[in-house]
Regions:
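Contiguous beta-strand segments within globular domains
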Residues: 72-78, 333, 550-585, 699-731, ...
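Proline-centered linker/hinge motifs at extracellular inter-domain junctions
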Residues: 537-539, 681-693, 774, 802
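Glycine-centered coil/turn sites that cap beta-strands in beta-rich domains
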Residues: 795-810, 814-839, 849-851, 860-861, ...
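A structural signal for beta-strand boundary/capping segments at domain termini and interdomain linkers
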Residues: 785-789, 844, 871-873, 892-895
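Short, surface-exposed loop/turn motifs with a glycine/proline- and acidic-biased composition
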Residues: 769-771, 775, 850-890
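Short, glycine-anchored, charge-dense loop/turn motifs used at functional sites
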Residues: 90, 833-845, 879
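Long, low-complexity serine/threonine/glycine- and acidic-rich segments characteristic of extracellular
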Residues: 585-677, 694-699, 713-798, 852-857
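Cysteine-dependent hydrolase recognition
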Residues: 1-626, 630-639, 647-649, 655-677, ...
């Protein structure tokens, strides 16, 4: 019986065992499995190799042989072969580039000698068993010259290359679309090179990751000067562990480096760093020693043209005008709870990172979601943090520049309590607010397994939401490595002590190069040339109630009217940008709040004390406003809500500005303002706000139809403004279908109108509502805590079908002009609409075809002048018309008939 194997968590084991077997042609191997007393435990046998000594005897085939103990001995060994008449030669293939041979002149028995001290490998060549080279079906190869053309421009002159995109030919169109964007938007010299061409020139046409690396090295080594060498490498395609395409639905689009050790999650590294280690004697990919990355690398996980188009579109949208907004001031950190004592370093480590970012880059609004500070609830599947999960997903949908998670995780999601899963990733709806997703966890984005798509991949793949890019883990990572890399990466990403803004992938490259250890399990997923969309400095508060800030002693008392003035200045903060015109968004926060985690799992330290953590949160948002910026200057007014915390202390103002002409954005902050106390001279106000409710747009009428994910709109007005300070019982809330135990808190979704703090709007997206009638009860408060309540009803119809209601034409009867109106359930979708005018005898006299897209559910875009298809005026009288609407996404259609009268 062979001895049992054991392990501390490896997924497979290889063991060389020595035993005695009978000297016969048939050998039986018996395996006895010890389950350790666990009936449910299983072992999975891959294969057994039986290796034994045998006589060197010819048998009509060529064969390989070696003496395994040769390296353990010194001196000379003699090999004797029998039945060797047909063995013409013995080859020494120990060095495949220097093969030696021993001749046999037809003797039935012959021998040769060799020195011991090392293992040597031989092949006995039988004259009747010569192998024939395989014939490649692709015998014609087109002329090409990558080496001669890659560093030349269209005119044939030398030009350094900034950005290389490597992709197979079938993805070329979208790779070129991305390249064209960066040529125009990023001023980079970009080239797209197909894998097939790289293989032809660097590996004789065969798939070889070494060929890709050697091609990249050739470009890098031939840059004109160090500062102009190749900077970015985009591996434009998904990857797989199966290089040989043996499995169905494989994703081996652009191959990735795979470590030889495939038996453990810690050792079975896959990494794209291999392609960037370009100095001499680098590229061994050992997890020890120093091997620097010479350029930044990223992989866009795309497997077909549709997916490629979606991911390139996200890159373009990340830079579009619609993506500019105050969400770019936000950073969200999320920590796992403490299940065992050593895990306390997870939450304390990332909390310290958040505080460091606040100190180094004070314009950043750091939101902290420490799961252990939420109430833990028991469920059938284990303990959960439903409120933390909701806050996590809501924060993504509302927008933040970076999400940074530290804790346990895996291919299916984050944390044992499942605070973020695959379904969450697929249902995110944060278009134009795509964040960088940083996950310090295990295997969250293990993208080389086609059998099991991960939550990380779904986060990236979401075409209308999710992440723009990810710094993420593909295998197991230790807490120490994760903490060190996360801190170093954040330092480079935000440029501590500087105003630098390097590409995200470059920040990771520098962090990994500076790390004294291996971080091969950390990968960058996404376009390596994009930079984090950090607004530029500097927006400055200059006056409070017309008094210079430096001289002001004003305290923001509850119910005090406040006027704030400021300027948009240059990066250094010393010169106003007098040609700056645009808009400003502002958030004013109450004093910071200190919180303590709960220690939900009851874990204690070595002294028996419950492990909890004190941490600092931003105060409640007491005002969200918008103002115009004219010639670099702005001002706005608001009334401080009654619900501020009364003790006086430092508050915070967060500014964000967007320029109208010459698209750019700026940021700023102030933490010197004082908030607290009550205004004893506040004017009386006992009148509540006024409100109007709609679904999707202002044409909606209560009781109308919607799709399954409508937008709820509430337009509010009050002479002193709306309260968003989250005082107890004074939140802006929506109650769906009377479920008061699960209200929707809408404070964060309220924004004032431009230059008017007395009016504003709530815009909240509902998701996946059930088909049927629904009622929303809405309640809001003004800053004096006077309430308003209103209600709206709507009918959800399934999104798969096209639903028509309220089909009419206006005016009707008409003389020379009418519009065709209808409500539908397909907002934001191009609809093919046809209107046919028919006489009472059935003759079609006019056909109108038009594609319409509406933000809401009402369409009134189609007009008719009363003329037929030939341009002639048709006669007076009654006509029938058929209105047909077809979805361009599902090809489903519906139609309705109505009457019209021409006078």
């Amino acid at each position: 019986t062979f001895p049992p194997t054991s392990s501390d968590g490896d997924v497979a084991f290889e063991r060389a065992l020595t035993g005695s077997v009978p000297a016969s042609e048939n050998v039986a191997v018996k395996i006895q499995y010890n389950n350790g007393g666990v009936p449910s435990a299983d072992a999975y046998l891959d294969y057994i190799i039986l290796e034994a000594k045998r006589n060197l005897q010819g048998y009509g085939k060529q064969f390989r042989f070696q003496y395994n103990d040769a390296d353990l001995n010194t001196g000379v060994i003699q090999y004797q072969l029998s039945s060797a008449a047909r063995i013409t030669q013995v080859w020494d293939i120990t060095d495949i580039y220097n093969v030696q041979k021993v001749e046999n002149n037809g003797a039935d028995a012959f021998s040769f000698k060799a020195y011991m001290g090392e293992d040597r490998n031989y092949i006995a060549v039988d004259a009747s068993d010569f192998y024939s080279p395989l014939k490649d079906s692709r015998t014609r190869v087109a002329n090409q010259n990558l080496k001669g053309s890659i560093l030349k421009n269209a005119q044939g002159s030398f030009q350094d290359l900034d950005y290389l995109i490597v992709t197979p030919a079938f993805l070329n169109s979208q790779a070129e679309r991305l390249a064209n964007f960066h040529r125009t938007n990023s001023n980079l010299n970009v080239k797209v090179v197909n894998l097939e061409n790289i293989y032809e020139e660097f590996s004789s046409g065969k798939q070889d990751i070494g060929a890709i690396r050697n091609f990249v090295k050739y470009i890098y080594n031939n840059g004109s000067i160090p500062s102009k060498k190749l900077k970015y490498l985009n591996l434009f395609g998904d990857a797989s562990f199966d290089f040989k395409n043996r499995i169905s639905n494989n994703t081996n689009i652009v191959p990735v480096f795979q470590a030889l050790n495939s038996f453990s999650l810690g050792g079975s590294i896959m990494s794209d760093d291999y392609f960037t280690m370009l100095d001499d004697n680098e590229g061994t990919m050992l997890q020890t020693g120093s091997q620097d990355m010479e350029l930044a690398v990223g992989r866009m996980l795309v497997s077909d043209l549709k997916q490629a188009e979606e991911m390139v579109t996200k890159v373009i949208e990340y830079h579009a005008i619609e993506s500019y907004g105050k969400w770019r001031n936000n950073f969200v950190l999320i920590s796992d709870d403490v299940d065992v004592a050593w895990e306390n370093s997870i939450q304390t480590g990332i909390d310290a990172l958040g505080d460091q970012i606040s100190a180094q880059k004070p314009f950043v609004n750091v939101e902290k979601i420490h799961t252990d500070s939420y109430v833990q609830e028991a469920s059938a599947g284990g303990f959960r943090y439903p409120k933390a999960r909701k806050d996590f997903v809501d924060a993504i949908n509302q927008g933040a520049l970076v999400f940074n998670y530290f804790g346990h995780g895996g291919e299916d999601g984050l944390a044992k309590e499942r605070i973020f899963e695959k379904a969450d990733a697929q249902n995110l709806n944060n278009r134009y607010k795509y964040p960088l997703f940083v996950t310090v966890t295990c295997e969250f984005t293990r993208f080389d397994n086609p059998y099991r798509p991960t939550a990380g991949e779904y986060t990236y793949w979401n075409p209308k939401g999710g992440a723009i890019s990810m710094v993420t883990t593909t295998r197991q990572i230790s807490v120490t490595t994760g903490q060190d890399i996360n801190d170093a990466f954040s330092n480079e990403l935000y440029g501590y002590g500087t105003t630098n803004n390097v590409p995200i992938s470059e920040a990771l490259r520098v962090a990994k190069n500076n790390y004294n250890g291996s971080a091969l399990m950390v990968s960058y997923v996404g376009d390596p040339a994009i930079r984090l969309a950090i607004p530029k400095p500097t927006i400055v508060l200059t006056k409070i109630n017309d008094q210079p800030v430096a001289a002001s002693t004003f305290v923001f008392n509850a119910l005090s009217p406040v006027k704030l003035s400021g300027e948009v200045r240059n990066v250094e903060g010393n010169t106003i940008l007098s040609n700056y015109n645009g808009s400003l968004s502002v958030n004013i926060f109450d004093k910071n709040v200190q919180r303590t985690t709960f220690g939900n799992d009851g874990v204690t330290d070595s002294s028996g004390n419950l492990i909890v953590m004190d941490f600092i949160l931003l105060g409640e948002t007491i005002f969200r406003g918008n103002a115009s910026v004219a010639n670099g200057q702005f001002e706005f007014n608001f009334v401080v809500p009654r619900d501020i915390a009364i003790p006086v202390g430092n508050g915070r103002i967060s500014f964000y500005a967007k320029r109208n002409q010459g698209l750019e954005d700026q940021t700023g902050y102030n933490t010197d303002i004082k908030i607290g106390g009550i205004n004893p001279n506040a004017t009386a106000d006992n009148i509540g706000p006024r409100v109007r409710l709609y679904m999707n747009d202002e044409t909606f009428i209560s009781g109308g139809i919607t799709n399954e994910s409508p937008i709820f709109l509430a337009f509010l007005e009050d002479e002193n403004g709306i309260n968003t300070a989250s005082g107890i019982g004074h939140d802006i809330v929506a109650i769906l279908d009377g479920d008061e135990n699960n209200p929707y808190i809408l404070n964060d979704y309220y924004e004032t109108e431009l230059d008017n703090h007395t009016k504003g709007k709530v815009r909240f997206p509902f998701r996946n509502l059930a088909v049927g009638l629904h009622t929303i009860t809405f309640k809001a408060w003004d800053v004096y805590n006077n309430p308003v309540t209103a209600e709206i009803q709507f009918i959800v119809v399934g999104d798969e079908t096209v639903t028509l209601k309220n089909v009419l034409n206006y005016p009707n009867p008409f003389v020379s002009y009418t519009q065709f109106w209808f409500t539908h359930n397909r907002p934001y979708e191009p609809l093919e609409v046809q209107v046919q005018i028919i006489t009472i005898t059935g003759k079609i006299v006019k056909t109108i075809n038009q594609v319409v897209t509406t933000e809401g559910f009402l369409s009134r875009e189609i007009t008719w002048d009363g003329k037929d298809d030939f341009g002639d005026k048709i006669g007076k009288g009654v006509y029938v018309y058929k209105l047909t609407v077809k979805s361009t996404l599902t090809n489903k259609k519906t139609e309705k008939y109505e009457k019209l009268v021409i006078l």
